[in-house]
């Protein structure tokens, strides 16, 4: 493994084309622990991409590839199996979207790439990025997700889709019904692989994988890749290229992390109300560990005359989509959510994350707070810590080699 230091990177957010520059001094501290044969391709022009794809990349607002894009895209295009780990907010989604689009034969109206994601929202966002980047290619791409009409899925798949992005359950269902034909699939991408391969999705991924042609290329992308996950990759990857960030560098440099000591659960609500008074928030996400807590807190905040919106996995798909749309557009400014929101959803203007509950596992911590300063933007994360949570907080600090200080009085100035 060779370690390559990373120079400053320009990254971009969603189709609105907001430019966010990762500060150079931050990026030099991130070390990629990478297979020796991986070289750096500094521009999109030198990646050997097709013209119509390049047009889409520049039209989308990208100028210079991010660190992960400079390393991974060329390897994926070459046909290598790739394990890519990159900080939250450094352009992971576009990394595999560009690679997938480059490898398609548009003339062949069959599914050639399959992208699996742990949540419906993430699968939907991947589809949007694919369609935007592939705008000049006439690419057909479908999001195959639970909570939507099965008949519509079947109709779209019968029409012919070059790429299918989806959640494992629905994708497997479509393969079993023979609506999603797998014979032309060349590439399988697992996004947020740590979450996907955890107990809940492991079986479903294996079910899907069994139906794919034996020579299918596999790419695994995630912000965290714990050791036990890497062991599992041996089962369905051949001589993979590794593009890894050292674990303790994964906390984003631009994010200031604080804790507020609350002795008991009941005190959290008052603390949150006090914070509302002192913080002029641009946009904020408040995380709770359970759907019930999200509903309870939302109701309590509204009773206290605070305007909030909320989202969790039990809500109907249509409702979740409209809540996300409102939040993305800035129409709603505070979102209370479970971890369904924490994975890979781009809302560039979020500058504050509050962990009303500390996450149940330490890997989720980075997914949550990595949201609040995407592409090196400034962000603040505030953790509400009960007496019996101190141990968990110290564990998170140690795991990410970071420091979480007590929240200062002037926290509003940092946002």
Swiss-Prot record:
Pfam family, one: Helicase_C
Molecular function (Gene Ontology), one example: RNA helicase activity
Catalysis: reaction(s): ATP + H2O = ADP + phosphate + H(+)
PANTHER family found in the cross-reference section: ATP-DEPENDENT RNA HELICASE DBP3
GO biological process terms on file: mRNA splicing, via spliceosome; mRNA transport; nuclear-transcribed mRNA catabolic process, nonsense-mediated decay; regulation of alternative mRNA splicing, via spliceosome; regulation of translation
Subunit structure: Identified in the spliceosome C complex. Part of the mRNA splicing-dependent exon junction complex (EJC) complex; the core complex contains casc3, eif4a3, magoh and rbm8a.
Placement of sequence motif DEAD box: 191-194
InterPro entries linked to this entry: DEAD/DEAH_box_helicase_dom, Helicase_ATP-bd, Helicase_C-like, P-loop_NTPase, RNA-helicase_DEAD-box_CS, RNA_helicase_DEAD_Q_motif
Localisation: Nucleus; Nucleus speckle; Cytoplasm
Gene: eif4a3-a
Motif (Q motif): 42-70
Domain Helicase C-terminal stretches: 254-415
Protein name per Swiss-Prot or TrEMBL: Eukaryotic initiation factor 4A-III-A
CDD domains: DEADc_EIF4AIII_DDX48, SF2_C_DEAD
Coiled coil: none
Binding site for ATP: 64, 69, 86-94, 346, 371-375
Gene3D superfamilies registered for this protein in UniProt: P-loop containing nucleotide triphosphate hydrolases (3.40.50.300)
Domain Helicase ATP-binding: 73-243
UniProt keywords, alphabetically: ATP-binding, Cytoplasm, Helicase, Hydrolase, mRNA processing, mRNA splicing, mRNA transport, Nonsense-mediated mRNA decay, Nucleotide-binding, Nucleus, RNA-binding, Spliceosome, Translation regulation, Transport
Entry's EC annotation: 3.6.4.13
UniProt keyword Nucleus present: yes
